[in-house]
Amino acid sequence: MHNIAGSPVEGEDFFGRESIVARLQEILANDDILLLGPRRIGKTSVARAVMKQVRAAGWRAIEINVASCVDERGFLDKLEAALKPELSSPTARAADAVGDALGALGRRIKSVKIPLPGAGSFGVELGEGGAEDWTQVAGDVLQLIAQMEERWLIYVDELPILLFNLIRNDSETGVQRVRRFLDWFRNDVRALPDARKLRWLISGSVGLDTLVQEHGMADTINSLSHQGLEPFSTEVAVAMLVELAGQYRIPLSDGDAGSIVAAVQWPQPYYLQATFHHLRSLIGAKPGASAASLIEQAMDRLVQPGADNDFHHWQGRLSQQLSRADADHALAMLNLAARDPSGARPESLLAALEERMGEATTEEARRTFI
């Protein structure tokens, strides 16, 4: 196993979550999955491991990242781009016919109708020819691949960011468009012939659950199996660090590894890898020092300017998915909780929130807090 802190891991570098991959694969036999959690907890690594497993079971699997998409056509473009190489595979049955049909659908994608921000219910035609509603074209794309013999897994990364982009860029109809997107996914897709051949793994580093609750559309995701990635147990985290140390010939006892886990406090693989990276660097600079004597310095390096970008990113996500006022409230509560390693009691957080919200009643503050 290699010391990789940041990039998704595969093969021998994937450690400690084999049982989770097996459980997700089992769920996908009958249900679609919503996998949410902050950045750097291994969602992409797990999703790709699931893709590998279902392929071994005879499925086809594609991955699309929609974080850069600002509208529904962007989603369709990503879907088409991911399908093209998969359908050009020589092992695909009737690939030529399906590929030709996909090409025709690609031309339709260029002319789908999407709402024009600020224009109310009016749409805009993109490209030449008659414009269609994007949901019709999307449904035809999915129906096309469902005609093939194999089952399909479509892994969509950062879908919540696309939906937040719709709302941010279209203050007039953005919420309606998000509702339509999620209704299409829940109802239209499931109603397609052979829909059982299509399974979806949706992931994101911002809260889709938060978005739908805020806008009164929680029902749109109730058909998804909600899953998360818990941190490693102490035993698994220690085993990972000891294996890493063996790879790099660094003397590290189980006790030393346990001290690292205790210092990290939230032993997600990334933070263990990042701490080990800094520990390796310090050992290289101080070859006579023991690993145990350098653990505290390695932890300090995690939060030094330039190395703490991931923590700033979390703060940015709050601003992205919450209103300015609610994001400020959230930061205030986090600052209060961070004063003590054991956190803060809900009553203390609620009292601080009531003070910040001024004229709000206790019940209004409680609803915001929840």
Q: For the regions a protein language model found, what residue spans apply to each?
A:
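A short helix-turn-beta junction within AAA+ P-loop NTPase domains corresponding to the substrate/partner-engaging
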Residues: 214-231
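Sensor-1/coupling segment of RecA-like P-loop NTPase cores
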Residues: 146-155, 161-163, 171-215
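Conserved catalytic network of the ASCE P-loop NTPase/AAA+ motor domain
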Residues: 26-27, 54-57, 143-149, 189-196, ...
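Winged-helix-like regulatory helical subdomains adjacent to P-loop NTPase cores
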Residues: 254, 263-364
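Conserved nucleotide-binding/hydrolysis micro-motifs of P-loop NTPases
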Residues: 68-71, 160-161, 205-210, 233-237, ...
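Walker A/P-loop-proximal flanking segment of P-loop NTPase domains
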Residues: 1-54
